[in-house]
Amino acid sequence: MPNIFDKGMGYISPEDKQVRILARDNYRIWITLIHICLLLLYINVSSAQENRESAGVWGDQQNGTYKNPVLNADYSDPDVIRVGDSFYMVCSDFHFMGMPVLKSNDLVNWTIIGQVYHRLNIDSKYNTMEKYGGGSWAPSIRYHEGKFYVYFCTPDEGLYMSTATDPAGPWSPLYEVKKTGGWEDPCPFWDTDGQAYLGHSKLGAGPIIMHKMSSDGKHLLDSGTTVYEGPTAEGTKIYKRNGYYYIIIPEGGVGTGYETALRSKSIYGPYERKIVLEQGKTNINGPHQGGIVDLDSGESWFMHFQGVGALGRVCHLEPVKWVNDWPLMGVDNDNNGIGEPVSEWAKPNVGKKFPICAPQTSDEFSGKQLGLQWQWNHNPVDNKWSLNKARGFLSLSAMKAPDNKHAKNTLTQKLMGKLGVVTTLLYTDQMALGQKAGLCLLGGNIHEIGLIKTDSGIYVYADNNGKLIIGKTIKQNHLFLRARVDLNNNHTILQYSLDNKNFIQLGDDCILSDYNYWKAVRPGLFSYNIKQDTGVAQFDWFHYQHDGPSGGLH
């Protein structure tokens, strides 16, 4: 009897897969009971081993400490808040749709719980693959009177906000607070007297400008007052503590800068200035913008990013000590009054221990919706993809495009950590003449491993940033595709397999580019046609092993 629960381990025909899904539905109670028994046995016998295997080379170490970066992925321009016992984070994602909302119980282990938006209907160029580097720049998230607020600017279109009573969503449709170009990095602030403000910088970094804002956060009430000018001042985050207004900003540039605290008894200044975090003798270059949170235990913490090439801008967590009403971030190793980033530290004291986790990656495509980890490159064409056309498969209909950069409906997610193995299973039954489909690494350089249908048959191919390598004819109706990512050496290997056991490299090792258009290299699934709008690629599953918490690759 075939194993009807053997999901995604090898070849399954589309018809067999749907039979298996129905079988799983019919035997759900039976399966659940078996799983409970196995889970209890597993916990009793091997919980210690599980802990050792779950910890990765970054994040939670399962011994009361963490290793930076706590999020070793391109969560650029992070902002974080605490509401009750939970922490929430948002980040910029530019031309990728849309903006993820993450949740943590301890500032170290994070999972994706929602998306603020799924498309940008503010310029037709987001539909035509012409807004690389546009979209959402550095956002801020705040909580005020029972409601979550997210603000961000796009470089060309304006200042936008969205609200939700539940950070997992639904979020309100994007509201245009101001139609303008050249603004960046907004942050709202509601003072204790009820007056609302919004601070921001201008494209190119600086100056810092403060506006009065309506209490509902939808309208700016004046033209703004410049409160600070400094070297590449950006990333405005506003706080109030012990009678001081604080503006926390990065200065000096993404790669070589530092973190600055400004403080004043008036929100309009004048502001005192102090550098509070610098690279020092560490290898954490340019510690950049982020957010501060306070804990009930009395601790304070700062989440910020570091730019690290092809992996993008990864998130570090620093302890914060308040000295004479100034924040000292990290550890002052040389006693110069300025903190330096920590590489490993005791986890925040939140009063409890929580399970290890990392943002979602793998997907079986068996649900009714895409996993929250997925983001389309530019706006999706919604009638050209489906999880329902063939149940248990992601179906991507091909549209005409000359190459991957201009192809619509490329589905991507973030690289996790420096080492990773990404594998997918692609079916060819509905592919059309001229169609290309497969697995890509999308960045400044674009690399593909996939299938192309020609007059003479279907061939496996690799595209190493424009260097095309055509492999053998594929006569079966499916192929396993794999990318082995090694960011320690900044390259990836493209492979394919007929049986998910023996993988063959096609072409030379690929050199991965540094982050491009402000975003890191991303794995993705693609389907486009160089001749016509026709053909469908069916992806059975997407599996991702990485070197982080619960990543399975250590």
Where do the model's predicted regions map?
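Carbohydrate-active catalytic/glycan-binding domains of CAZyme proteins
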Residues: 48-554
